[in-house]
Amino acid sequence: MAISLFCYSSRAAEDVKGILNLLTVQHPGLFAEKFLISRVDDLKNPTTYSDSVSVEIALEHDMRASCLFLVDLNDKSAASLLPTVEAIIKSALGDSNVLILFNNEERR
């Protein structure tokens, strides 16, 4: 079974891209091997993203999301590190600026 963290952020997509790039440099063993970070989808740009469902999912959790990215578990033996990954992302983006949903369903 695939495990993904759906990460919605109220920060601008370009800001999030920069922060995620920094995280991959700071934690190469974590984000280059055990977990994979997807590209950042700009939910505010209708030419690059037209799925309003993602915006609605975030709104259901009181988040006005500007962007979305996924963190996929690449190494099944690293599943116990999910709370660590969540904490790193929340710390980097600001806890109030990010909504993390386990498989796009369960709030973390």
Positions of PLM-derived features:
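Short, extreme N-terminal segment that most often corresponds to the first beta-strand
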Residues: 1-32
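Generic alpha-helix signal with a bias toward terminal, lower-confidence helices
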Residues: 17-20, 35, 81, 85
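Conserved short beta-strand edge segments in small beta-sheet-based binding/regulatory domains
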Residues: 29-37, 96-103
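Ser/Thr-rich, low-complexity intrinsically disordered terminal regions
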Residues: 33-49
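Charged interaction segments
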Residues: 44-108
